[in-house]
Amino acid sequence: MRLILRTALLLVAAAPAAAQRTAASTQFDFSIRNIMRGPELVGRPPQNITWSPDGRWIYFRWVEPGTAWNEDLKPFRVRAVAGSRPERLTNPQMDTLAPLVAEGDLSRDRLFRAVEFDGDIYVVDMRRSTVRRLTDTRDRESSPRFDAGGQHVFFLRNDNAFSIDLVNGTVRQLTDIRTGTPPRDSTPKGMRGALQREQSALFDVIRDQLRRDSIEKAERERRDSLRTKPFWLKRGERVATISISPNARALLLVTAIRGADSARQTIIPQYVTRTGYTEELRVRTKVGDVQDSGRVAFVSLPSGEVKWLRIVPDDTTRIAAQVSVRGWNDAGTAALVSAVTNDWKTRYLHTISVTDGALKTVDVLRDSAWIGGPCQGCAGWADDRRIWFVSEADGYAHLYTVGSDGQGRRQLTNGKWEVTEAELSPDKRWFWLHTSEVSPFEQHVYRMPVAGGTRERITREAGRHDVTVSPDARLIADLHSTANRPPEIYVGTLAPNATIAQLTTSPTPDWLSHKWIRPEIVMIPASDGVPVPVRIYRPADVGGTPNGAGVIFVHGAGYLHNVHNWWSTYYREYMFNHFLASRGYVVLDIDYRGSAGYGRDWRTAVYRHMGGRDLQDHVDGSRYLQKEFGI
């Protein structure tokens, strides 16, 4: 048996001379030197796709075909009409338009959007496509959100919360969070204190000064009592998130406590440096070493009273490693918080009452390996009394709802497939879902009523679809790719089985002139009886002549999905696999145990045993090559 199980580059170097024949088109230089040009040949897909408020334009960052590989992405826009061509925007033009197309928080009536751009806060009129600037400071403001009535915008500045009145422009500070050492009582103690008391007893002038100081202090304290009450964080603690209730009755403060600073970090030598000397890159800590943690405070407004919450219930030994506020319900009566323990084996969902900070656990997910999977952080409010979230509770990432009291848990999707993205429509009538329902090798978009029921498939073309919905929910900007075509922007209607029209073309004409295949996906039998997905490149598929040898490509990145019908993140290797097949090699690309896309058990199959099933799947791949191709 001749099996080459090394890096692809070395495999080609070992190829028999008699097999160095290619079926590549004479119009295309099918050489390693050419295909490894990467983005200069294949192009770079559009990124940061957003819509204009009126839904007429799609904005994105991109470079035109043939642009140098190290050129920065540029701003573009294209009309959301079939046959339109992208228009390049200058950076000053984009700076003017950026607040208009930035993501942000919609007002309750969906007529305005609060956004942040370049550290300042703006409000966008969605009907008139106009922008009102609210702040213009050197301080960085962020996280703008409307209050329940749409009359105020909350935002953050210098790790504190503020509110601005949209009618009169008044800015009010809602929190006074401080770091460092709290001030101490400066009154002298001991001998010096006794001496000071003696002085006031002996001299009228000292008593008069003390009386005036006492009156002034009382007045300062009276005025200070009308302001937000300050409170101090621990040493080494910082503000991570502040989330204000829509009715401004309370806020949640999430802090981060640095632990990784004291952990030992792995080092990688960096040989190519400006100085000419080898330098050290400190890149990451080891699993199980000291890590960051966080805690959550409930702050009553306007009093500023603070209540620290036990976010991991019934356990004082564990601190949450990851805490995120998933939002408040529209009524402002409760917040939703997600917390993952620092061993990554338990995820809690809690509701927190705006009245007193009372915490109610509504869902707990435990995993003996680790919490993960697609859409792991997807959660929010379906309405004022129900929560939606994605969980791997049944072994696959699916959508659930539960009451804010923890009752009435319902699973809205099920099957041996995954919900990879979930979003609630602005009117809260629909879920927009990206799923692998068709097969693990496809990603399509569906629309489903918020209460569950029949899902309507929006996209129909094979491959992967990443959809951004227009503000009026009529159109979709679809970043669509197939196994042999990179992602491009398409436009279509948000309707079942909609037809989409291509608006961008990223690869060079040179690359498009070559016949790139969609590799067949086969299931090979593993030694434990489980079928393992494989992309296969045969010499006959690309016009080559078999040379009796095979190559097994091993994708890296651990938890990655690479066997699918869409464009691979390993696109250079995709082209290289063509190159090998054209020269006679049978190439296998295996989604071994530990890869993404096949549910929780597949994802965690390598837990504490890397080099077990993942390696055996490749050994079984070599047996498949021997059996099917005599290699």
PLM-predicted stretches and their roles:
Residues 2-3, 18, 22, 566-567, ...:
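Compositionally biased, low-complexity segments enriched in small residues
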Residues 9-10, 165, 328, 617, ...:
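Extended hydrophobic/Leu-rich segments
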Residues 428, 457-459, 464-631:
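Serine-hydrolase catalytic core recognition
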Residues 2-10:
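Sec-dependent signal peptide recognition
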Residues 19-469, 474-487, 491-494, 509:
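Beta-propeller folds
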Residues 9-19:
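Hydrophobic h-region of N-terminal signal peptides that target proteins for export
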